[in-house]
Amino acid sequence: MKVKKTYGFRKSKISKTLCGAVLGTVAAVSVAGQKVFADETTTTSDVDTKVVGTQTGNPATNLPEAQGSASKEAEQSQNQAGETNGSIPVEVPKTDLDQAAKDAKSAGVNVVQDADVNKGTVKTAEEAVQKETEIKEDYTKQAEDIKKTTDQYKSDVAAHEAEVAKIKAKNQATKEQYEKDMAAHKAEVERINAANAASKTAYEAKLAQYQADLAAVQKTNAANQAAYQKALAAYQAELKRVQEANAAAKAAYDTAVAANNAKNTEIAAANEEIRKRNATAKAEYETKLAQYQAELKRVQEANAANEADYQAKLTAYQTELARVQKANADAKAAYEAAVAANNAKNAALTAENTAIKQRNENAKATYEAALKQYEADLAAVKKANAANEADYQAKLTAYQTELARVQKANADAKAAYEAAVAANNAANAALTAENTAIKKRNADAKADYEAKLAKYQADLAKYQKDLADYPVKLKAYEDEQASIKAALAELEKHKNEDGNLTEPSAQNLVYDLEPNANLSLTTDGKFLKASAVDDAFSKSTSKAKYDQKILQLDDLDITNLEQSNDVASSMELYGNFGDKAGWSTTVSNNSQVKWGSVLLERGQSATATYTNLQNSYYNGKKISKIVYKYTVDPKSKFQGQKVWLGIFTDPTLGVFASAYTGQVEKNTSIFIKNEFTFYDEDGKPINFDNALLSVASLNRENNSIEMAKDYTGKFVKISGSSIGEKNGMIYATDTLNFRQGQGGARWTMYTRASEPGSGWDSSDAPNSWYGAGAIRMSGPNNSVTLGAISSTLVVPADPTMAIETGKKPNIWYSLNGKIRAVNVPKVTKEKPTPPVKPTAPTKPTYETEKPLKPAPVAPNYEKEPTPPTRTPDQAEPNKPTPPTYETEKPLEPAPVEPSYEAEPTPPTRTPDQAEPNKPTPPTYETEKPLEPAPVEPSYEAEPTPPTPTPDQPEPNKPVEPTYEVIPTPPTDPVYQDLPTPPSVPTVHFHYFKLAVQPQVNKEIRNNNDINIDRTLVAKQSVVKFQLKTADLPAGRDETTSFVLVDPLPSGYQFNPEATKAASPGFDVTYDNATNTVTFKATAATLATFNADLTKSVATIYPTVVGQVLNDGATYKNNFTLTVNDAYGIKSNVVRVTTPGKPNDPDNPNNNYIKPTKVNKNENGVVIDGKTVLAGSTNYYELTWDLDQYKNDRSSADTIQKGFYYVDDYPEEALELRQDLVKITDANGNEVTGVSVDNYTNLEAAPQEIRDVLSKAGIRPKGAFQIFRADNPREFYDTYVKTGIDLKIVSPMVVKKQMGQTGGSYENQAYQIDFGNGYASNIIINNVPKINPKKDVTLTLDPADTNNVDGQTIPLNTVFNYRLIGGIIPADHSEELFEYNFYDDYDQTGDHYTGQYKVFAKVDITFKDGSIIKSGAELTQYTTAEVDTAKGAITIKFKEAFLRSVSIDSAFQAESYIQMKRIAVGTFENTYINTVNGVTYSSNTVKTTTPEDPTDPTDPQDPSSPRTSTVINYKPQSTAYQPSSVQETLPNTGVTNNAYMPLLGIIGLVTSFSLLGLKAKKD
């Protein structure tokens, strides 16, 4: 915190009201239609004023008025929010349809126009586009259908006409062809008859010759056949002999071949081994050969490279050698030529130098004559030039003056131009930024569209799949429903039989087992460590089972879970897993179970969320999540304070709840309320419809009853079960069910070998229904309370049914869907929903970027004046140029003989590498030849069979000719009938009706264009209402009027100029009477809307600009749009609140803005209104009230108004201790970024501070300190927006002079937030006047008021100075720690006897309640210090005694100091009373002592020296004990006038007195 002090003049005044606030008189502000802004609504006055305008409950110093009532127009408009009246008709172009109908009529088609089809009224342009697209598609389809029908009909007519013409032509051709065919037929019949007669004659002659030739051939052939048969018999005999001889020869040959094959097999095997060895040798050779060839190649390549390098170097060498030799020859030739030329040139130079010498002598004589004439001419020219220069300088001065003026004018114009350029650049930068934003919005719109399109395509694919699956799923569902219906009909017949639901129902909640569920917990109690739970199981009541590796939950003593180090920061799981794997539990025997543990008090809760559910369904639809809230019933009667909940990870296992502390309890109970909600796959709460929830294992013994109560839904009894319902509680209502035969129990709950039906209390027991029932539940949120209670708290005590013995206050219960009734059908199939085809997303309309503003025109700069022209100086005469004497030319040096280049060194050839040795080819083994094959024998050739003589062929029998058949005459022609004309078709068409109700949306924003609907903004904030209208649809009628009417809320100050500036395109009017603003679209705007009626058009919107001017106000607003006087709609209602409104539903932190001021003492005790001693420190505690601003959305300009805290303290009474000022936040953290300045008065403050205070209506009376946020934005973000109050502790010391005068002072503070001021309460304290008094008395009686001040005291008289201390009033602010009497008496005339006494002047009450009465002696609670040399005595109260006095008690004491008058004269005396470090002087007493010659005692010589003797006197050595005050002190004043010995040390005092007397005498 930075501290700064500023000093000024302030007129001092001390009175009963030393401080306060001078509040500016707050001008009345109209709540509607006012033409001034909030910054202008306060005035100040020079007179003190009080805080006004607390109508809102907020102590505002400016704009204090409460918000007025809403106008009738505003209320009516808001009550009708969202209502519409009329619509905008949309006409979809139907040109194509009309043309198709017209063409159809022209073509002769029967055209019928049907009634118009109403497509309804849509809300948005997008919906209109969709509908218009549907209509367009329908019109297109109608037109296409009509055109198709028309074209078909026209085609049919044309085809019919063509077909008629075709048939007629064809029939004519048929007729002509028939006549032609008949003539040809007749000619052909005549030809055929003649030809057939000639063929028959020729055939009959050939047949006679054939028969004679056939008889001769048959005879020859019979003789040839007989000869052949004879030859054949001889052939067959010879063939047999040859075949037998050949068979014998072949057998001998086959034997020889077999022997030869065997021998050759052996040879082949040997040859195979030879081949292998040869192959190995060959491979090795080829490897070496390859290596040789590679190395040979490398060597050859290297040698070739070396040779190539050598040849290249040789070529270069030869080239360079030729060049060097030529260069050297050229250089030598040039040198020799140069030598000859040099000799010739030097001879010429020698002759020329002789001529030069003569010319130089002639030039010198001529120059000296010209120089003399020049000097005379030069003097005349200089005189004329001096006159010209003076004239030029005068003109130059005038020129420079004008030039400066022109340059400044041009610079100013340039600066203005550059400022305009900068403004233009800034504006264009803003437009560029806006265009960038537009690009981003367009890109976002495109990305959003593409994302929606991708989703649509995915949804479409899913839809198509779902559409294919739907019939299958529907069939499965309907089959199951039919099966369930049949089962329920059967169960209805048996509902009164054991184990059946009395109200048969299907179980649509499948919720039996979830071993893999995930559990997460939250709690307002405490999480327990798993190690703490394990430790608790290992102790006391549960130890025995623990040692057997059994976790017996109902034996666990929960006091072992109540240590501070048992608490975990989050859920930890425990159970028979991990290092407890293999252990058993009483919950599920050897099956693994896990649970999280919490420790709760009555009324506390734990909320469990179960996920990863795999087996649970409702109506066939998967359950994804269950949320249970477990709350300890505050009415539970268990004796302890804590309940341990073991919440199982499997929600179907439920909860183990225990308040068992190791001892059974009588008349006890423990109940847990279970609130639960089930969620479907989409994360939505499931709305149960008669879902069955099992309540099972409800045991009843004669000392304990387990029950369910306070449940939603309806109880369903199971026939034969012991569980019923009574008085809203579900339990075994009529009998016990613990052991057979006891209290009417039918079976024993646990298994007994000798008892059939025992063990019903197991989930898999066939008669588990005996201890169970069901609850039929509906709705998304349900609850049931379960627990256990002593029987005597439910039914009267009874030896059988209810005995008063102790029980453990614990219970394990589970809520699941496992209904114990028999044959309950389950719903496993979800009723499939017909898939809905997704709608394709609408392609976005992209915003158009705004053009940049043109650059400003560069100014026309003034032309700078023409500088004066200097009169040219007369040319000085040309001074004759000294002659340039010719220099004799030196002779040319002899040419240098050239250095010839050395010839290059010839290159050296790199020697070739030696080629590698080529490997020797291997010597291969020779394979052995095979044995030659035996020679096959020569077999005898078989004899040649005889060849029969071929038969002579028989002659060919002549073929009887085929006579031509007489052709069939042509058929009579068949003529084609003409086709039937096509029937005339009928086409129908219809038009559509479509209307649009464009939607409107009202938005409320701050000056940073941030949405502030249903939020909080500071008073005086600029609030903008944006009146937005959706796109006007395509196909609309021309828009002739577009009017928006907005009845503004009360307390909202309308700014017409800003509104007009923010609403281009609209004419703005304002009705002050109704506080209503009306926007009418201009002609230009309407022209834009009507530019293309075939396309939708984006509307522009007006913006209402104004300020909110009330504390604790709610500003609600909507508007009405009217288009063409045919369509009207009321917008949504927006709402914004200002701070200072308690019970604000939109802003729960909102409350009154009330800075507070409290005065405390050093111990932190509030001392408002108490008496405060001078010199004490006031610890003023100022609260900067910021919590109501939490979640504020004020704009940056409002925030920049700053945050201030003003402390108007009374500088007349208090001294500021700015070095001790401390600022902390509500969390105790030190606040940084706040500076504090101190000003002696308002006039001493800078103008900035004066303006802030003036606008806030605050005028401090005098000095004040002001705290301000250095960086308003950081302060706002850190403390204001987060709603964190600040505490300022500002210590101030009560000035000492206040104790001299007394009086009251008051103190007030103010906070200024966003320019709005609020006053704190006023603190008033009173400073008592401390007025010590001094008397001179002759007695020690406090009741003796005889004062001899101003009188005569005889010499050697013993008397008393009575020192009456100042009174400390009752109810003072801080403890007394110092109350002293200091008396500087005149030791020349008075001698202190060493005796004093102290008495109470008022009743004194101590902190322990004891009282010392007025008049009681207090000497024992004091000490005295005496300096006899200086004549000073100090009597001090012990600090412990003073601090034991109650601050509610008054305090005053008086001291009596005994003196003896030892000198003659007049003596004056004053004493000082010190109270808590502040000294107060008493009145001065004066006494006179005359000479007394009869007095035998020599008076002390005033001039004699005195020895300084300091006495520290402590009348009592014991510390003050308030409790013994009544026992040791009298309750009344002391009336004895004699001085009593002071606590046994009078001898010591006397000794000091004697020493003092002795010193005087010495």
UniProtKB/Swiss-Prot annotation:
The keyword Kinase does not apply. InterPro entries: Adh_isopep-form_adh_dom (IPR026345), AgI/II_N (IPR041324), Antigen_C (IPR032300), Cross-wall-target_lipo_motif (IPR021197), Glucan-bd_C/Surface_Ag-I/II_V (IPR013574), LPXTG_anchor (IPR019931), SA_I/II_PAC_V_sf (IPR036234), Surface_Ag_I_II_A_rpt (IPR009578). It is a peptidoglycan-anchor. Keywords: Cell wall, Dental caries, Peptidoglycan-anchor, Repeat, Secreted, Signal. The lineage of its organism: Bacteria, Bacillati, Bacillota, Bacilli, Lactobacillales. Residues 943-958 have a biased composition (Pro residues). A motif (LPXTG sorting signal) lies at residues 1529-1533. This is Cell surface antigen I/II. It holds the Pfam family Strep_SA_rep. One of its GO terms (biological process) is protein transport to vacuole involved in ubiquitin-dependent protein catabolic process via the multivesicular body sorting pathway. The keyword Calcium does not apply. Ag I/II A repeats lie at residues 147-221, 222-303, 304-385, 386-467. One of its GO terms (cellular component) is extracellular region. Surface protein antigen implicated in dental caries.
